[in-house]
Amino acid sequence: RASKLLGEDITKDEKIEKLKLIAKETVDIRGIGFYTLGKKRKSLNEQEKKRYAELFEEYFLKSFSSRLAEYTNPEIDVQSKEKLNENYTIVNSILKATNERPEIKIDWRIYTKNPENPLIRDLIIEGLSLARTQKEEFASVLNSNNDDIEALFKVLEEFSKN
C-alpha cells in the first residue's frame, strides 16, 4: 500500500498524512516505543508510561512518514522469509536501485503473535536495526540527563513540533 501511495501524484503533505494512517495499522508503534525505552520503562509510573506512549507515537509517525515521503515509485522485491519462532518472522527484501539511490537491503522483523494482524516491529536496513539505533539514542539522552524521563519527553516534544 505504501509503495502504491508513494507513486501517486499528490502533495508531500498528503503523502505524509496517508503514510501515518498506514503505519498506525501495520506497525507495532507501542511495542517499538517501549522497546526503545529500554530498562527505563520498568521504573515509570502509569502516567509517565501513558505520556511516553503518546509522545513516542507522534515522534515515530513524523519520523517514519517524512522519511518515506521522499521516495517515489519504490520497488521492493521480497527475497525470502524465515519464521524465527511463534512470535517473529523475518522478511528479507531489496529496495531496488534507481538513478537517485542505490539498491538497499531491508529486513522486516514482523511480530506474528496474532497471525490475523501481523505488525512490523523493526526494520533492519543494510544490517542496522532502526529500533536498536533509536534505543541507543534514547539511552544517550537519559544518560546525559541523570536518567530524567522529562528530558526525553522534551526531546520528543521538540522533534514533533518542528
Segments predicted by a language model, with ranges:
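Early exported N-terminus immediately downstream of N-terminal targeting peptides
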Residues: 1-64, 68
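Short loop or secondary-structure boundary microenvironments that flank
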Residues: 9, 82, 124-127
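Juxtamembrane/interface motifs at transmembrane-helix termini
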Residues: 37-39, 70-75, 140-142
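Solvent-exposed loop/turn segments at secondary-structure junctions
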Residues: 41, 58-59, 97-98, 125-130
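Surface-exposed, charged secondary-structure patches
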Residues: 62-104, 155, 159-162
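Short beta-strand edge/turn micro-motifs at domain boundaries
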Residues: 103-132
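Low-complexity, intrinsically disordered terminal/linker segments enriched in charged
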Residues: 122-162
